[in-house]
Amino acid sequence: MEAKISNRIPGTTIEMGMEKPMTGAAASAYGRIIVMSGVASSELGQQIAEYLGTPLGSYTRTIFPNENIFIRLNESVRGQDVYVIQSMCAPLHENIFEMLIMIDTLKRDSAGRINVVIPYLPYARSDKKDQPRVGIAARMLANIIETVGADRYMTIDLHAGQIQGFFNIPGDALTAFHLTSDYVKLKNIPDLTVCSTDLGFAKKARNWAEKLGTPLAIIEKRRTGNDSRSEALSMIGDVRDRNVLLVDDEVLTGGSAVNAIKLLQSEGARDIYFVFTHAILARDATDKLAACGLKEIITTNTFPIPQDKRLPNMTVLSVAPLLGEVIRRAHEGRSVGELFNE
């Protein structure tokens, strides 16, 4: 993808993708695969397209002086199997609305099937009515995506698995566990203990421990405010004189992570590795992690990470091969579950 002018300047136009036709795609009931990348996911979208051996679908995106978004397809998608890749980073609501306009545009051009690929699904913490007079934004977002015209969805490592039930359309709730755990396993870290950041993540942390053949420790913590603030209380398990792999699904402001790391250090842990799927890294999260003395930070590109937030000890694994293979299998009508059993 090549952006001619910055997408944040009202009154400007950018060209997305390439117009040459795809070749070599497997046939399906929905025609050929077309990958359309939102502006926020240009790098990931290009990687997925390259994995599939196809150019990105071409469209023109204009932001008018009143900040209205206008999208025009530069090629016909009639009857085709279209995959809209959109990362939900800042500006979040602009990116959500861009995705919705894209879906509507594809629907009105008679696309055969419209698949939304949202590597990081926003509002995942708003999955239940746990306080008086609050909404359930995750359910609302699922309803909007369906109503606009999406036929299928894909996402990675949902914060709450029950969000799958908010969608009435078929979808694939994927995991980056195999990608990240395979990377860690190849490192052959000696004297390793896997540690969960909290009780809620303990089940997934156990999967890590079983795959790596290590002991499991769990940090018990108590929330002191909203989800961006927490306090680590105690350690379940022994990490003294052990290398520790701290596992979580996402890092927002880094508060929970810093508390967990400090507790591990106070309990006598040696080198600490920190692995998580979604690197949101809001506010000063990067500075907090940089000051913690971590051996290595391992994450993925489900959430675009700018260069100024990529620390020297940070390894970013691409989810493009995972998403690309799932897209191929969905297009060909093959099992996605088999991918994780191979």
What are these regions (language model features)?
Residues 1-342:
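PRPP-associated nucleotide enzymes
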